[in-house]
């Protein structure tokens, strides 16, 4: 190899080494940025909890929380914190607002660090906050999809629908299913027609005031007219006979 070729080879090696160093520096900088974004140098992925685990966490948080009602609209979370700061360390304060108007609903929740702090806060029930007595009680665990008026409303609905106060809905596994009729209701009635203690007799000829009768002629039908306040029906044949008799008498 000539001297010129050796010089060119050295120059290419130097450029390759410098490029590798630059790439290493860039990789180190990227690693540092990722480490700053994550906690403890490793990115954490949020794990989905099951319903039982979520309910357990909710019960544990509610065991340290209280409900505060009858709050004036101008109360701020800082004022609530000052009112309950002697009870213990407060972890979270939640005030509820109307989603449509944005006005305060007049109640909220306070979560403490320990259940012992909650017991101290319950002793402040009936105290005054900005000149108004507040109501303090334990926080009730919220169950999604549960309505506290369900039991009372369900009884009225079943009574109207099935005419029984505590009758269960039909099981789809045992279809066809037909609920039994009550003793004072006929099969011709709709369900719920009997809810006002009104009894309607079934449609049969015995219970109707007018019964079907068959006559051989029109004269027989006029003799067997039922006794009502209406005027008796006069057949056309009788009118013709009465007019002919009057003419003959004249």
Curated annotation (Swiss-Prot):
GO annotation terms (biological process): mRNA metabolic process
Function: mRNA-binding protein that may play a role in modulating the expression of cytoplasmic mRNA.
Organism the protein comes from: Saccharomyces cerevisiae (strain ATCC 204508 / S288c) (Baker's yeast)
Gene behind the chain: SGN1
InterPro entries: Nucleotide-bd_a/b_plait_sf, RBD_domain_sf, RRM_dom
Region (Disordered): 1-27, 178-250
Misc note: Present with 6490 molecules/cell in log phase SD medium.
A cellular component annotation (GO) from this entry: cytoplasm
Amino acid composition bias (Polar residues), ranges on this chain: 191-208
Location of the RRM domain: 64-141
Full protein name: RNA-binding protein SGN1
């Amino acid at each position: 190899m000539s001297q010129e070729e050796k010089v060119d080879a050295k120059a290419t090696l130097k450029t390759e080494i410098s490029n590798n160093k630059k790439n290493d520096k860039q990789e180190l900088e990227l690693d540092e940025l990722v480490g700053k974004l994550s906690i403890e140098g490793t990115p954490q992925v949020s794990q989905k909890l099951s319903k039982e685990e979520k309910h357990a966490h909710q019960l544990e948080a509610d065991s340290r929380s209280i409900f505060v009602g009858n709050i004036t609209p101008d109360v701020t979370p800082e004022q609530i914190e000052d009112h309950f700061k002697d009870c213990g360390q407060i972890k979270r304060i939640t005030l509820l607002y109307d989603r449509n108007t944005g006005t305060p609903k007049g109640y909220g929740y306070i979560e403490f660090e320990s259940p012992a702090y909650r017991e101290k806060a319950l002793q402040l029930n009936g105290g005054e906050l900005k000149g108004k007595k507040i109501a303090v009680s334990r926080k009730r665990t919220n169950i999604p999809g549960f309505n506290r008026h369900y039991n009372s409303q369900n009884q009225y609905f079943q009574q109207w629908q099935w005419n029984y106060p505590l009758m269960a809905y039909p099981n789809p596994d045992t279809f066809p299913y037909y609920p039994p009729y009550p003793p004072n209701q006929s099969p011709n009635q709709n369900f719920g027609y009997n809810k006002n203690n009104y009894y309607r007799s079934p449609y049969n000829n015995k219970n109707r005031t007018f019964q079907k009768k068959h006559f051989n002629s029109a004269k027989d039908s006029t003799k067997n007219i039922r006794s009502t306040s209406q005027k008796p029906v006069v057949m056309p044949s009788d009118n013709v006979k009465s007019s002919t008799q009057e003419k003959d008498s004249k």
